[in-house]
Amino acid sequence: MNRREWMKLAALFTGAGSLPLLQACGQRHAMQPDAPLRIGYLPITDATPLLVAHSRKLFEAEGVVVEKPVLFRSWAQLVEAFISGQVNMVHVLSPMTVWARYGSQSPLKVLMWNHMAGSALTVQPGINSVAELGGKTVAIPFWYSIHNVVLQYLLRSNGLEVTESDTPGPRQVRLIVMAPSDMVAALAAKNIAGFIVAEPFNAVAENKGVGKVLRFTGDVWRDHACCVTVAHAHDVERRPEWVQRVTNALVKAQLWTLDHRVEAATLLSNAGEGKYTPH
């Protein structure tokens, strides 16, 4: 995520910045009170329940009309589409929901956790400890993310401090916000020393030989939250039975995934029928 994307996302989470989009969302809802389920997602495993439920027609089994999920490449694009009503259900980083709710008064509701843990700190092959990140740059998916919290805890536990300076000192680590889909390429180009993010990008880096997993976030903070599924508050308030049916499908998707992990991985990949991700 470049500075322009960051500023755009920050603006979306202020009252003034989000007002036109919220008005557009209200108009959409007035015109389509029974709108179909429109899912927006990033190509990361955090979207699993949404995509599994779509692929296995679990929404239809609950009587919910659903359109094909729409892939977005950045959090800014995803959040803008949600606030404006282009999509009416997305997964977002859990701390981001607090920022959205109290920063812009965005009328959203958290329906469920998408998963626990499931992320990792991946570094260049020559780095063997957290302490070796001193003087280097590490990418995070967003400031308001569990990834940022876990990483800063790890760094401080190893005597390092965080900075945004372009020239970090030997006991400092520069953190930058970057879209997950850009992280592997940045690591391969040695523009960053590491990144902390959800799968599949940690596995992609290892498979390409450009990085290795140094720590799993679940080993630092057991069963931590990561992404959550959110809906528009007006859907929850005005058609609660519809939201319940959607939630039922998502729960069934979670349960199926727990018992069919290999099948779920194939389903989510570019080899799957839905081709939900480019991986």
Regions found by a protein language model. Name each.
Residues 31-177, 189, 193-203, 210-223:
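Short, glycine-/small- and polar/acidic-enriched structural segments
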Residues 11, 87, 192, 248-255:
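Solvent-exposed alpha-helix faces
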Residues 237-279:
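Secondary-structure end/capping motifs
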Residues 44, 73, 145, 181, ...:
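Soluble non-cytosolic domains of exported or imported proteins
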Residues 5-25:
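N-terminal export signals
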Residues 129, 236-237:
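Short beta-strands and strand-coil junctions in structured, solvent-facing domains, enriched
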Residues 120-122, 228-231, 235-236:
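Short glycine- and hydrophobic/aromatic-rich loop-to-beta-strand nucleating segment
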